[in-house]
Design a protein with these regions (language model features):
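Short beta-strand->loop structural element characteristic of the AMP-binding/adenylate-forming
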Residues: 63-65, 72, 76, 80-119, ...
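Conserved AMP-binding/adenylate-forming core of the ANL superfamily
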Residues: 22-69, 73-77, 94-99, 154-156
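Conserved pre-ATP/AMP-binding loop-to-beta segment of ANL
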Residues: 18-20, 152-153, 163-190, 197, ...
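A short N-terminal helical cap/helix-turn-helix that marks the beginning
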Residues: 1-23, 42
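Conserved AMP-binding/adenylation subdomain of ANL enzymes
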Residues: 209-227, 234-333, 343-362
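Conserved AMP-binding A3 loop
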Residues: 34-37, 186-212
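ANL superfamily adenylate-forming
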Residues: 29, 119-180, 289-361
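Conserved ATP-dependent adenylate/AMP-binding module captured primarily in the ANL superfamily
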Residues: 93-123, 211-229, 259-274, 367-368
Length: 392
């Protein structure tokens, strides 16, 4: 198969050309800027053409040291489109860890988010055997300078040179994309290194394509024009795969922060329909709720009682609607009896659940209303029970 992630993006650009693909903030701004699909693809082509200008070849490794942002995805798609392999890492990595990953992956090009990450890399420049170029993303100046055998330049400079190369070679990136295969290595993601030196995990294009081809039937909520808020690191395969999934369906990705006040303000501002999360985010909300109700013994007992009722109600409802996994198909009689039993349980417990909603959970719902109205939410199962109860 000659199917790759960049090919999938190329196929949908015309379809969603005028829709927003990214919503992002610049600097200390509190307002969101937008980028449409057509402009996104033009920037991808300029980045790829800029890399071709600097002599990158198929199969070379490109390190991306950055937190989640729109440029991350642009660099990723440009790199993969050229048949290269990207090696992502977050800004919290140490100098020694970065040097090890750069050398171990045999990377020749590096993208760093800002000057702080640049200094980390340069502190180990004498140990970097193969590095030829370093690109600084967060720099509004256009510059290029030499430091020994390493060329350092800004993202802005890369775009300028890429635009020139693209005008002279308008088909070069398209030609490289068509050379790609689903069997090509797309990325090398290194483990955290908590039990020793980080280990590189290689993923092919087909690893991502497999997910893209199977998830849409189960997620009908993913539709063009909707907004997904992003708070997880893109250098983790989970967030990266999820962003591919939604972006290829015309959903805008809004970059926020996993910080309570920032996230809640962005929810109010954007009114997103989707979020990809981990239990820790919702655990913070849960702890805040528990802390508040624990101020009084009566509040604590009432809350705890109604929460247990809500969890039982949610489980009964889940089984009745067929959302729970069934490992052995029951016979018809047992299936009918089971549904009847669940239905009676739901009817009996509903008045108590409704009372809890009126007396307790209505007040909790109000500040969380935007979050609880999400159409698509991925978190740990036991935490979702609390959210299901609040939403029902």
């Amino acid at each position: 198969m000659r199917d790759t992630v960049p090919k999938r993006f190329k196929e949908v650009i015309t379809l969603y050309s005028e829709l927003d693909i990214f919503m992002y903030k610049e600097g200390d701004s509190k307002s969101f800027k937008k980028q449409i699909y057509a402009d996104f693809w033009n920037e991808v082509k300029r980045v790829a053409s800029g890399l071709l200008h600097y002599g990158i070849k198929r199969g070379e490794k490109v390190v991306i040291i950055s937190d989640s942002r729109r440029e991350w995805v642009i660099i990723d798609i440009a790199t993969l489109g050229l048949g290269c392999v990207d090696v992502p890492r977050g800004n919290d990595s140490s100098e020694d860890e970065l040097a090890y990953i750069i050398n171990h992956s045999e990377s020749t090009f590096i993208f760093v988010e800002n000057n702080k990450q640049l200094q980390k890399v340069l502190s180990k420049k004498h140990d970097l055997r193969l590095v030829k170029c370093i690109v600084v993303i967060d720099d509004d100046k256009s510059y290029e300078e030499k430091m020994g055998i390493i060329t350092i330049f800004s993202y802005k400079k890369l775009l300028e040179l890429g635009a020139e190369h693209l005008r002279a070679n308008p088909k070069s990136f398209d030609i490289e994309i068509e050379k790609g295969s689903s069997k090509d290595i797309a990325t090398i993601i290194y483990t955290s290194g908590t039990t020793g030196m980080p280990k590189g995990v290689m993923l092919r294009h087909e690893s991502f394509i497999f997910q893209l081809d199977r998830l849409y039937d189960y997620l009908p909520e993913i539709k063009p024009g909707k907004i997904m808020i992003s708070i997880l690191p893109l250098w983790h395969s989970f967030e990266r795969a999820c962003e591919y999934i939604v972006a290829l369906k015309g959903v805008a990705i809004a970059y926020s922060k996993p910080i309570g006040p920032v996230l809640l303000k962005d929810f109010l501002l954007l009114n997103p329909q989707m979020i990809i999360s981990v239990p820790r985010i919702w655990e913070g909300i849960r702890i805040g709720i528990i802390k508040k109700v624990s101020e009084s013994l009566i509040k604590k007992l009432v809350f705890g009682g109604f929460l247990k009722v809500g969890i039982i109600y949610a489980k009964l409802n889940e089984k009745f609607l067929g959302f729970s996994p069934v490992y052995k198909k029951p016979n018809l009689f047992i299936s009918i009896f089971s549904k009847l039993f669940l239905f009676i349980g739901i009817i009996l417990i509903f008045p108590i659940k409704l009372l809890g909603d009126i007396l307790v959970f209505k007040k909790i719902k109000m500040p969380l209303d935007k979050i609880l109205n999400l159409e698509f939410l991925v978190v740990g199962r036991w935490l979702i029970m609390l959210i299901i109860f609040l939403r029902l």
